[in-house]
């Protein structure tokens, strides 16, 4: 019994030895199979037989491991073992890691050159030698094992020993650029049919959408826009790359490319109503297409100084998405930085195009790769950009001390902040911190660099901030040549001051300047002799009316006349019936603009007023006489039109036809001419109680002139109501005379006649209406030059008839209504007297129905 276990143990030991020996001999018996394996196996070292594990890829299946799950070893079909599942999954993971590794270094690694025949033979012989050599003296590492290590530890990078960390970082950055480049390349590789279809879809959008206009080119560089405008009069609109949300008008005039910035502001018309306006010099528009139509249609110069006229749009032939990708690629690949700059790698522009805003900088400022070559000494590339980029706040100051934005009133209705730079007392090169209030909160304080200035601008440099000192002290050779592609030199929208700079430097800067002084400085800009820049002229307070009845000379009315002479009334009726409503509206508008000092303002008148335009004078204390004159003209115009209607003693059809023409006149004044003053006067005549009670006349109007009745009831009356309540206003680009009646009535309420409850008289919304009109007055005062320009455009080429101009003059109307004697009476007496006359005329045409007759 004792010998049996020993014999069994000996047999077991012998079997174990033979089994292990046979397993260890497997690689030698299958050497031919190993010779046909991949060439990469030649670097695999051959350790001792009992110490090394065999490769799964090139050996026969080994015995199953000691511990195995049933799901790994046996299938659901039977008990057949399947030990290769884990190995197949591991092999797939290794192959996937290998593909990822190859893609990540696709750009940085150079592809090996294809070997020739001799090299292939040598490689084959070397492979056989390595396969036969099993000594542990091999030095190279198995690439498959390297990939396995990569999959286990993903955070550990395999860096060759001869490659520096800087090179590896550059390769990784280049790999990121390659991914971004592929995205842009996908856009550029679109088929022409797809691009053409996309362009058609953009052009089919609403006309108010900027993308629907072919002259809009989106975000293209400044240099590209200059190459697109080739002939005088060519123009295009592009996005401002330095001021987010603004646009730039690029045109060519006198063989020179000019750039004009279009500022976007938010105008607060009421407490809860705001709308966006686009300011351009002294003009304001609802949208950019309206600005383009205005300048192209009127052939008005874009700026007074340059005299540039735009009339030939440069249309785009590709969609906006394609243009941005195309010019972005060309810009990023063409610009190279100095070797010392960390952002000088190729493709860095495309990598950083995805940045939208960094510390107030727009994309173009961040993506510059040729900024400061010595920026490696700074802690972060963003600091170098902050110190070397141009500030939009200082670009206008390099040209003129008066920025176009500086004209905007200090009103919460405007999003831009008034920027006034007082002249320094003595020229100084020391750095002084600038006030943070002098710039917009969304714009950083940046270094202007050594931007070249026009001649004579060296003594007008703005105060430098600490960042300015840092940038000026930098010995960078390329700093002087730095120029932002979009923020460069915008053309001046205001003429430069021609006064003596020495006197301006010697004077003490005033801390606060009123509206009159500021506008007087604007007035001085256009003076050739510079006399107004030396002394200040006190405005003259007018005490007498501009309507001088004593010196009035007329071709239609005699020197002495009685009120409402029949022959004179008949003559006026004939003159009004000879022309259409539009011609009448032009005559009325011309006289209105002359009275309100929108047109015909001379330099002497501006000196006496202290301001440039009558619209600003209306809001000032010494403009009281002008306010009274406008109130006189408004009521006199309404009464004369009412007399014209009530004096028609013919049939109801004749009065209805005259009523229809009056409605057409109101529509022309509102729409075609943009004259809200006379529009309100005509509507005031139609809404008089003496006219609105003529039921037969209005019934005939609805039957014979239905469109006129609908126009009056559905459009004109609601529009006038919204004007009086301060809820709605006409577009500034189409306005020649704004609706000034509410606020001049508020300012002169003790002198205005009582005509019933006003919109601001209600207890519910009275205060809101008053505030809306007072804020509208500030807007009116600010846009006096715009109304002047619009009036000149509307009346350009207009040949007025002297008789009609005289009929619509206030002196003629006063003489016609009250005679030569009564015209000099008090205003209250005249209005009260004529109210009774109008009531009598109305009852004569359509007597009131008595209660006994019902």
Swiss-Prot record:
The keyword Disulfide bond does not apply. One of its GO terms (molecular function) is transmembrane receptor protein tyrosine kinase adaptor activity. The lineage of its organism: Eukaryota, Metazoa, Chordata, Craniata, Vertebrata. Residues 99-124, 508-520 have a biased composition (Basic and acidic residues). The modification Phosphotyrosine is found at residues 273, 278, 787. Expressed in the olfactory bulb and olfactory sensory neurons (at protein level). Expressed in B cells (at protein level). Expressed in T lymphocytes. Keywords: Cell membrane, Cell projection, Cytoplasm, Membrane, Phosphoprotein, SH2 domain. Residues 34-43, 333-347, 400-415, 422-436, 474-485 have a biased composition (Low complexity). The modification Phosphoserine is found at residues 22, 354, 435. The C-terminal Cdc25-homology/Ras-GEF domain adopts a closed conformation rendering it incapable of carrying out canonical exchange factor function, this closed conformation is required for interaction with BCAR1. It holds the Pfam family RasGEF. Acts as an adapter protein that mediates cell signaling pathways involved in cellular functions such as cell adhesion and migration, tissue organization, and the regulation of the immune response. Plays a role in integrin-mediated cell adhesion through BCAR1-CRK-RAPGEF1 signaling and activation of the small GTPase RAP1. Promotes cell migration and invasion through the extracellular matrix. Required for marginal zone B-cell development and thymus-independent type 2 immune responses. PROSITE patterns: RASGEF_CAT, SH2. SMART domains: RasGEF, SH2. Residues 215-314 form the SH2 domain. This is SH2 domain-containing protein 3C. GO terms for cellular component: axon; cytosol; ruffle membrane. It is found in: Cytoplasm; Cell membrane; Cell projection, Axon; Cell projection, Ruffle membrane. GO terms for biological process: signal transduction; small GTPase-mediated signal transduction. InterPro entries: Ras_GEF_dom_sf, RASGEF_cat_dom, RASGEF_cat_dom_sf, SH2, SH2-Ras-GEF_adapter, SH2_dom_sf, SH2_SHEP1/BCAR3/NSP1. Its main location: cytoplasm.
